[in-house]
Amino acid sequence: MTIKVEQAIIHEIAQTHEGQLSCRLRPQPLLNSQAVELMLEELHQSYTSKSGKGFGFFGTHGNDGEANPAFANCLKDYLDGGLGFVEFTGVASKLLQDELGKYDFSQGGFLLLACYSHMASDYLFVALLSAKSSMTVLDDMELTQVNHLDLNNIQLAARIDLTEWQADKESRKYISFIRGRAGRKVADFFLDFMGCVEGINPKAQNKSLMIAVEDFVAGSELTKDERQACRDKVFEYCSERFDAGAEVDIKDLADELADSGMDSFYDFATTGNYDLEEEFPVDKSTLRQLKKFSGTGGGVTISFDGHHLGERVIYDPISDTLLIKGVPANLKDQLHRRLKGE
């Protein structure tokens, strides 16, 4: 187990026969059984590995639009010992019920709240889970339908870094959340019930880092291979941070580059017009451009490793053409077969 579970509970928000939402509150926390530990371990791993998450903080009513501070206030009371875990989660369920009541599309679900620690940080995980039907075989070999929690397709979940929240009140990224498939709008009501305001933009920060790296190598005396090695080093560092659930640390990254003979990146990145935070979450899809060129348009999709540019792949900006030397064998075979058939 990579996490230590402190407390967890599940409450249900469901529709009554009259179409109204109501809460069915569990009166005590879940037992720290193997089933609970395995479920939270699975959720921790899958949540941590999700890319494209949003980041935010608890807003202040009046200063951050209509941010409702009720959830944050209750959470603070719980952490200070003024509220028990069951009482805090019960209030949270009522807040979510009230928020869901503003919309016509909601069917409710099972609200999971879990406090756990991982490495040096304490977290509160909040997720609205749905039930999914499946089939099973009974002892007498008859089929029957059963419901189970759908842990593989969670769309409404957030994680609060309690350690960061308590240590740095100015932080704007101690709450992470899953973005809906159509963008943040899908998860608005879930963030609103917590009073979460979107803060740092990871994609923009990673884009700025990529631009800073490109400017850094362009202004250096590095050879072509050394420049690509620098890009690869940055991508490798960021990938390792992502896999560990950690953030990009510009000073730490600069030290890694310095160990490889590429000095002064920290001063270059922080004094230039890149608006980089000292630390920010990794967005691998953005940084992948350090290693690969790819693009799609007009029915054509092209992707190739960066070190091939200027060698196997030649770009002529004047004629707007790409020359590919050494066509991949499987593509060449398809082309030959098509030409023979014409």
Curated annotation (Swiss-Prot):
Keyword Magnesium: no
Cellular component annotations (GO), alphabetically ordered: bacterial nucleoid; cytoplasm
Superkingdom classification of source: Bacteria
Protein's cellular compartments: Cytoplasm, Nucleoid
Protein name: Nucleoid-associated protein Sama_1557
InterPro entries (UniProt xref): Nucleoid_associated_NdpA
Family, per entry: Belongs to the YejK family.
Main location class: cytoplasm
Signal sequence extent: none
Keyword Cytoplasm annotated: yes
PANTHER family in alphabetical order: NUCLEOID-ASSOCIATED PROTEIN YEJK, PTHR38772
